[in-house]
């Protein structure tokens, strides 16, 4: 039986456009061996009043709410996890925190900019409900990765690593 960590990451390639209003990011499952099959895409769009809108079109995910973050590095390859063992997606690095706040205060707080609202996955494994991240733009996310974690998100300093191993990038 094949098991893979269900955390997803999308490495977002930089484009030549100086101020792109939208970007489509292909998402792939990842595991401790690297990048796996495509599971869908995210459409990222800047909005004038609200911030970054993220419209998912994803399939094959476990049902429930998932932690959803922008990570520093555009590489979603495997690396060493917090327990010292090989783990999926660790090359993505930590959450995007350009002001070096070191704080996990959620998508509407004054902490790091990597927190996004949770991604809701329906009973059939599809994620199609858009979220808006008020403090991000498409330009902020370019050259980084987006990770969908295996579990929910408590937006705290205490990470639930057992439920937050990473799993999927897109280039």
Where are these regions (language model features)?
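N-terminal leader/targeting pre-sequences
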Residues: 16-171
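Gram-negative bacterial Sec-dependent N-terminal signal peptides
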Residues: 1-20
């Amino acid at each position: 039986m094949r098991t893979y960590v269900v955390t997803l990451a999308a490495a977002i390639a930089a484009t030549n456009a100086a101020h792109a209003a939208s970007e489509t990011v292909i998402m792939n499952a990842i595991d401790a061996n690297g990048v796996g099959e495509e599971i869908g895409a995210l459409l990222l769009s800047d909005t004038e009043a609200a911030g970054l809108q993220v419209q998912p079109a994803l399939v094959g995910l476990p049902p429930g709410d998932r932690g959803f973050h922008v990570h520093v590095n555009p590489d979603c390859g495997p690396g060493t996890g917090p327990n010292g063992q090989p783990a999926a997606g660790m090359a993505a690095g930590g959450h995007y925190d350009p002001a070096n706040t070191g704080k996990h205060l959620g998508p509407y707080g004054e902490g790091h900019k990597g927190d996004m609202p949770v991604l809701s996955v329906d009973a059939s494994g599809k994620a199609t409900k858009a979220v808006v991240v008020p403090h991000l733009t498409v330009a902020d996310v370019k050259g980084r990765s987006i990770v969908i974690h295996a579990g929910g998100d408590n937006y705290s300093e205490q990470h639930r690593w057992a439920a937050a191993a990473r799993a999927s990038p897109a280039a």
